[in-house]
């Protein structure tokens, strides 16, 4: 992050975005503009209006997400189609998280041949666990905080753009640990 700026304009951007946004973004050198606008007050007006033409990411523009309806690689098309046939709608992040949770527990029960909670937990957070989850690599849980290690999709509203971790990032345990805070930096303990 090179610089953080607070959007404190009160003008109606539907009429003035073409003038306000270039001035707001002028003077800074950046590769991508990351927007945090959960309320939707200004973020929609930033695309194609910045002083320098740069990608927009965050709550508007490109979005990092665990699942997106346009994800089609590694068998995801079949997963999407099965879900859509059953539910009559596109699979969302919440649906994918629920599927991953249930599938993980089912996998742990099958592999341990046990319904003992401590054995299931030990297997889930152990080195042997890995779940094929339509992301190109098996997902797993970090033993130290319980966080799901998974590739993150970078999507535009109607298309997939990329899958992270990006090529070239290496880690001694898992490429998936290159994203977010790693064990030495984190204060989160499960």
PLM segments and residue spans:
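Extracytosolic ligand-binding ectodomains
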Residues: 1-190
């Amino acid at each position: 992050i090179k610089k953080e700026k607070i959007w404190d304009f009160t003008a109606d951007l539907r009429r003035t975005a073409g003038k306000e946004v270039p001035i707001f973004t002028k003077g800074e050198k950046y590769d991508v503009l990351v927007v945090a606008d959960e309320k939707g007050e200004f973020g929609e007006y930033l695309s194609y209006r910045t002083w320098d033409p740069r990608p927009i990411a965050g709550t508007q523009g490109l979005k990092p997400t665990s699942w997106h309806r346009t994800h089609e690689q590694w068998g995801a098309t079949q997963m999407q189609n099965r879900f859509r046939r059953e539910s009559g709608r596109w699979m969302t992040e919440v649906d994918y998280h629920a599927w991953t949770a249930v599938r993980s527990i089912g996998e742990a029960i099958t592999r341990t041949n046990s319904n003992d909670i401590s054995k299931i937990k030990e297997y889930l957070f152990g080195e042997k666990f890995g779940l094929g989850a339509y992301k190109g690599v098996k997902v797993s849980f970090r033993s130290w905080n319980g966080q799901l290690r998974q590739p993150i999709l970078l999507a535009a509203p109607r298309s997939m753009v990329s899958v992270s971790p990006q090529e070239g990032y290496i880690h001694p345990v898992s490429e998936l640990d290159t994203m977010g805070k790693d064990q030495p930096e984190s204060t989160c303990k499960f």
